[in-house]
Structure formats: structure tokens, C-alpha cells
């Protein structure tokens, strides 16, 4: 079975011609490039046998440098040396300044509220910085492979939302890359481990990098990779370990950095200390006029809450997947931060088994991406690997009464397309507003708005006669497109969802938790809203009928009786007693039964007026 080859980009009709393709692990701290060469998947190394390329760009007066050269400028020129741009991508300036107040950069806001970093070469967006990194990786890969790349697979955290994924694709396009696919980092690791070890069963992929954390629960069976559930934190990683350790060192030295250069030097020292403590139980540290010893135990205490935070996310992912901890067959460790002994110990205790670390955790994602790229570019058309990712949050549409109708439920396998049919609410309605929502709650006010568009040109008919088919489609990169079409005329409108910025980790967590804690209240609110909608429809229908035929077929007393029932139902509708509203609808229906019969008789009389008996028969 081919890997979702229905219409994968990058594939051609000439499968026997070997094409150059690479997998790019675009990391927060470091990036890597890997490729399949002579049947072997390898990470590309530079002239000094180094695999890791720092995800750093330095914008100098005369030139721009990327990678190791740029990283060397971090302490010398911190305001023009952009590190961890991946943390900023797809976020608003307000979010960035709140979340990362200690960054040494000078920010200004773009027209749509996104952050721009002021550098010697002008204002740079996180997308442009990422594009510069990708351009560097592209040149490096083409130099190593000796030819032009036909396509790339770029990995992203599984919990990246639409804005962050789209921003990553925009960066790749700016860099001139042909993106075959965006691939979730944990899924890429599963590909690498699944092909190497042939494991089957449920596995957990614990991915703790420099700036992001992801957990994925996957089922591996007969070459099929199915993601059962994902969870993550887009603002948790090894960088946070560094900041905690840096603060501790500053406190011990009784000295706070006085400028951006000293702050960068302190962070560099903290990173070096963290790495040393992964090998030794204690290490010497010198900062300002202070010299002392930091033990692994002290470091463990500093990062304990952050590690526990990651394990809470793991617990939610297990619940979402519907599996117990003991069902996990293997735990795959991904990301350089999983080298920290305390992280490995805590993860091992949580899952009750020793984590897998046989593949270099820094390289495993790039290796999996390279395998995927080799298939998508057409070099392995007979591959039997099937990869199934999932939608992390439900996608829905607003309906009458401020309700949310879920079109694609959370954890549906992607790519996926789902459609539902809706109708008009008013007589003569010629347009319909489509409000696209994301979240797990029942009411619009409790979900996240992704976008709106209007379908115009609906033929004017009585309410409920027109049929509008709304289709939601999530592609392999997790990007959403929504189309609304009126079935009789085929008139349609659509939207490609590209939010201006992404969800914070707190918002993602809250959206999931609140759907559980408020489930009962949400359902009661939904039932009340649905009853109010039914009341509105009944009232509108009766008022329209009265305007058309009431004066002709009803006595004054009958007319007033129906008006009184309408007024009563309008009053009941303002309250919160669902049963009372339902009874009001029944009372109005009962009060209009005679009116309905008289309207039917009147309609028959008008239809037969002036016609001979033989014409009717």
C-alpha cells in the first residue's frame, strides 16, 4: 500500500529516476538535515563532522551568517543575533512580550500585530528568520548531495496550530523550497524507530527539544503508524531549563546581568553546565566574582516542576487515546533535552519501563523525515508504510442560537474531509454567514473563532427549502479549508484558514480541560439554546401565517388568542426553564391547529376557484 499517494505533492510519473530529497528537523535550538543515500538513511555532516546546525541567524552591518558562525556572535551582538525564532513563529507581539520578557531583541509590531525584530539589516519577522535558516540548510544539503533538491519534508511540533504550521510553510517558500509535507516531529521519530526495530503495539513518543514539548501516543501495526492522540506545550523545553539554572547561578553570585551581552553569557554558561551535569554528578561554575559547585541533585530540584508539567500532558494524552499506562509497549525519547538523566528517570517511572534511546535523540526526527521525503518524492513508490496523523482540536461551525456543530471531531485521522448539510432560517434568505470554530465546548462563546466568510447568491425560498453543503477539509499538514455550496445553483464560497497568530499552551490546555469539567453545564446550555431556536422558528412561522391569512380566516377573538400565546412564548423564551419553553411551543401549536385547518381549506378553495369539475377530475 502506498503512503497516501492519492495526490501527494512532489510525486511524478517517473518513479525510476532517483530524486534528491531531504528531511529537515527545523528545531528551536538546533536543526539537522538527513537524506536516504544508497538505501541508508544518514544525517548530513559538515566538514568537521558536525550534524547539528544552530538555529541562529546573525544580521551584521555587511553580511548575514547562519548556524555556528552566527551562534558565535550571540554574546557579542545579542540584539542582532536571533536565537530560538521557532518560539516566536505564529505568535502575536503581545504574546511574545508576555511569555518571553527577557529576550534581548528590540521588537516592533507589524500591521497585523505580529512581532518584528529590529536588526542592522532592517526589521525581520520570525518567518523571515526561519527562511534564512532553511535557505542555509538547503545550500548545505545541495552541496553535500551534489545536486538540486526535488523536495523536502520539514518537521514541526505536533501541537503547532494552523498559524504556526502555515508560517513554517511560508518560511520554506521564501527559502525557495518545495515542501512535500510538514510532518509531526514525534511521528517522524516513530517512522525511524518503526522501520529500524519492527515493533508493533502502542508506543509513546516523548519529545523534549530546546523550545517545545510534544507527546504522541501511536499504534504501530503491520507498517501502519496511527496517531491515537497528541498533546504538547509550545513553550516548554531545554531553554527553560537553561533560564532556571541561569537565574540560580545569578542568585548564588549575587549579581544580575547588567546588559544583553552579560545575559547571553550567563545563558551560555547555564547551557554548558546543564550538558556537564548530564555526564557528571557535579561541576564547577564561575560567574562574575563567584565560583562554586552545582550538583545534579540541585539541578533536578530546579527543573522538577517543568518535568512534572510535561508528565501531566502525558497523562492527558493517554486519556485521550483511551489507553492505560501499562498498555504502552515502548517509550521513544526524542530531542536533545531528553539526555538529562532526571528527565529519563521521571519518564521511565511514569510509564513503568525504560525509555528507548538507541537512536540519537537529536537525530531521530531528521532520520524519520528523510525516510518520508524519499517516499514522497517518488523514490519508493512501493513503500508499505501508511502514516495517520490526527486533528488535535475539534473543528465546527456556528448554528442558530450560538451553538457549535462539530464537523471534524478531535483526534480524527488526517488528511480528512467531512461535510454536513444546513438550510436557511428565514424566508427569502439569500446569504449565509459561515463561522468556523475550534474547540470542544458546545457554545460559540466558549470556542476559538478561526474565521468567517459569507455564501451569497442563495435563491430566495421559504425557510428550510435551500440546502447548503458545508465541507471541512484538513490536509496532510493540518491546514484547514472550508467550502459552502448551495446545491441547486452550485454557487459556492470558501476560506483557507490562516489565523493571524496561534494558541498559547495555556489556551490549548484550557480548551481541552474545560470541555471535560463543563460537560454537564454545556449540554444543559445547548439543550436550552436548541429549545429557544425551536421557539423562534415556531413564532416566526405563526407570525408569517397570520400576516398572510389571519385576517381572512380568523375571528377577532381567535386572532387575539393566538397573539396571546405568541406573547407568552416570547416571554418564556427569555427565561432559562427549558421545559417551560417546550410547553409554550406545544401550547402555541395547539392554539393554531384550527387556524392551520382553515388555511388549508382556504388554499384548496383558491386552487379550485373558477375550474370545472372535469378539469379537476
From Swiss-Prot:
Sorted UniProt keywords: ATP-binding, Chaperone, Nucleotide-binding
One GO MF term attached to the UniProt entry: unfolded protein binding
Pfam families on file: HSP70
GO biological process, one term: iron-sulfur cluster assembly
Keyword Chaperone: yes
Superkingdom, taxonomy of origin: Bacteria
Family from the record: Belongs to the heat shock protein 70 family.
Function, in words: Chaperone involved in the maturation of iron-sulfur cluster-containing proteins. Has a low intrinsic ATPase activity which is markedly stimulated by HscB.
Official protein name in the record: Chaperone protein HscA homolog
Amino acid at each position: 500500500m502506498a503512503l497516501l499517494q492519492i495526490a501527494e505533492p512532489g510525486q511524478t510519473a517517473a518513479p525510476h529516476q532517483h530524486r534528491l530529497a531531504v528531511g529537515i528537523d527545523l528545531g528551536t535550538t538546533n536543526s539537522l538535515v538527513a537524506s536516504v543515500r544508497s538505501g541508508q538513511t544518514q544525517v548530513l555532516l559538515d566538514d568537521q563532522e558536525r550534524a547539528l546546525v544552530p538555529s541562529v541567524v546573525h544580521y551584521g552591518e555587511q553580511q548575514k551568517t547562519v548556524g555556528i558562525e552566527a551562534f558565535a556572535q550571540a554574546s557579542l551582538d545579542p540584539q542582532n543575533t536571533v536565537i530560538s525564532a521557532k518560539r516566536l513563529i505564529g505568535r502575536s507581539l503581545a504574546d511574545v512580550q508576555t511569555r518571553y520578557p527577557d529576550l534581548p531583541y528590540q521588537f516592533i509590531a507589524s500591521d497585523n500585530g505580529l512581532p518584528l525584530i529590529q536588526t542592522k539589516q532592517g526589521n525581520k519577522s520570525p518567518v523571515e528568520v526561519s527562511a534564512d535558516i532553511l535557505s542555509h540548510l538547503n545550500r548545505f544539503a545541495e552541496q553535500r548531495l551534489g545536486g538540486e533538491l526535488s523536495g523536502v519534508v520539514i518537521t514541526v511540533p505536533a501541537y503547532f496550530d494552523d498559524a504556526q504550521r502555515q508560517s513554517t510553510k511560508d518560511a520554506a517558500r521564501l527559502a525557495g523550497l518545495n515542501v512535500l509535507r510538514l510532518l509531526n516531529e514525534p511521528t517522524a521519530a516513530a517512522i525511524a524507530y518503526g522501520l529500524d526495530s519492527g515493533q508493533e503495539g502502542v508506543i509513546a513518543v516523548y519529545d523534549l527539544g530546546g523550545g517545545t514539548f510534544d507527546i504522541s501516543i501511536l499504534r504501530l501495526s503491520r507498517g501502519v503508524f496511527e496517531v491515537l492522540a497528541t498533546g504538547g506545550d509550545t513553550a516548554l523545553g531545554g531553554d527553560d531549563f537553561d533560564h532556571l539554572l541561569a537565574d540560580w547561578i545569578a542568585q548564588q553570585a549575587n549579581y544580575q546581568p547588567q546588559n544583553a551581552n552579560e545575559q547571553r553569557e550567563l545563558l551560555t554558561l547555564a547551557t554548558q553546565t546543564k550538558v556537564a551535569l548530564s555526564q557528571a554528578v557535579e561541576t564547577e561554575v564561575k560567574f562574575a566574582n563567584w565560583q562554586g559547585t552545582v550538583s545534579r541533585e540541585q539541578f533536578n530540584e530546579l527543573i522538577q516542576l517543568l518535568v512534572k508539567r510535561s508528565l501531566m500532558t502525558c497523562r492527558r494524552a493517554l486519556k485521550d487515546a483511551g489507553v492505560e499506562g501499562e498498555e504502552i509497549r515502548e517509550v521513544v525519547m526524542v530531542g536533545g533535552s531528553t539526555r538529562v538523566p532526571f528527565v529519563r528517570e521521571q519518564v521511565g517511572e511514569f510509564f513503568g519501563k525504560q525509555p528507548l534511546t538507541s537512536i540519537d535523540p537529536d537525530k531521530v526526527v531528521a532520520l524519520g523525515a528523510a525516510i518520508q521525503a524519499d517516499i514522497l518524492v517518488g523514490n519508493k513508490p512501493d513503500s508499505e508504510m501508511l502514516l495517520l496523523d490526527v486533528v488535535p482540536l475539534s473543528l465546527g461551525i456556528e448554528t442558530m442560537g450560538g451553538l457549535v456543530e462539530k464537523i471534524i471531531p478531535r483526534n480524527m485521522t488526517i488528511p480528512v474531509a467531512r461535510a454536513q448539510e444546513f438550510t436557511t432560517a428565514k424566508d427569502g434568505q439569500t446569504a449565509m454567514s459561515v463561522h468556523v470554530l475550534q474547540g470542544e465546548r458546545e457554545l460559540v462563546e466558549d470556542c476559538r473563532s478561526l474565521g468567517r466568510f459569507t455564501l451569497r447568491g442563495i435563491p430566495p425560498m421559504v425557510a428550510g427549502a435551500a440546502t447548503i453543503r458545508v465541507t471541512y477539509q484538513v490536509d496532510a499538514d493540518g491546514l484547514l479549508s472550508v467550502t459552502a455550496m448551495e446545491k441547486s445553483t452550485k454557487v459556492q464560497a470558501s476560506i483557507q484558514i490562516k489565523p493571524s497568530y496561534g494558541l498559547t499552551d495555556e489556551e490549548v490546555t484550557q480548551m481541552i480541560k474545560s470541555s471535560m469539567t463543563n460537560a454537564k453545564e454545556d449540554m444543559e446550555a445547548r439543550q436550552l439554546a436548541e429549545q429557544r431556536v425551536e421557539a423562534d422558528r415556531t413564532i416566526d412561522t405563526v407570525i408569517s401565517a397570520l400576516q398572510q391569512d389571519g385576517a381572512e380566516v380568523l375571528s377577532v377573538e381567535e386572532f387575539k388568542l393566538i397573539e396571546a400565546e405568541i406573547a407568552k412564548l416570547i416571554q418564556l423564551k427569555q427565561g432559562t426553564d427549558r421545559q417551560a419553553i417546550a410547553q409554550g411551543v406545544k401550547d402555541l401549536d395547539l392554539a393554531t391547529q384550527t387556524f392551520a385547518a382553515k388555511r388549508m381549506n382556504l388554499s384548496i378553495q383558491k386552487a379550485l376557484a373558477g375550474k370545472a369539475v372535469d378539469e379537476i377530475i
